[in-house]
Amino acid sequence: MNLKPLADRVIVKPAPAEEKTKGGLYIPDTGKEKPQYGEIVAVGTGKVAENGQVLEMQVNIGQKVLYGKYSGTEVTVEGEDYLIMRESDIFAILD
């Protein structure tokens, strides 16, 4: 991947959507919910404060994170789907 986020942005690879219900029924593409978690694949340099100091990012490549249902901008690169979002759009890190 050749995407490098700027400032306090991160690039997240969303988890795949559920293919079937717990009862075993297959979900059509139109009925699938977008996942609200994924893995960070790239991290920007950090947010620039008003005094010019760069604030270090709190997330790292490879971490699994939770984010809002409508967070980020969807992009497709080389056939892969990604979300570009600000670090502040991330709610939590999954251990």
Curated annotation (Swiss-Prot):
Keywords: Chaperone, Cytoplasm. GO terms for molecular function: ATP binding; metal ion binding; protein folding chaperone; protein-folding chaperone binding; unfolded protein binding. GO terms for cellular component: cytoplasm. Pfam families: Cpn10. InterPro entries: Chaperonin_GroES, Chaperonin_GroES_sf, Chaprnonin_Cpn10_CS, GroES-like_sf. CDD domains: cpn10. Its main location: cytoplasm. The keyword Cytoplasm applies. GO terms for biological process: chaperone cofactor-dependent protein refolding. It is found in: Cytoplasm. Together with the chaperonin GroEL, plays an essential role in assisting protein folding. The GroEL-GroES system forms a nano-cage that allows encapsulation of the non-native substrate proteins and provides a physical environment optimized to promote and accelerate protein folding. GroES binds to the apical surface of the GroEL ring, thereby capping the opening of the GroEL channel. Belongs to the GroES chaperonin family. Heptamer of 7 subunits arranged in a ring. Interacts with the chaperonin GroEL. NCBIfam families: PRK00364.1-2, PRK00364.2-2, PRK00364.2-4, PRK00364.2-5. This is Co-chaperonin GroES. It comes from Prosthecochloris aestuarii (strain DSM 271 / SK 413).
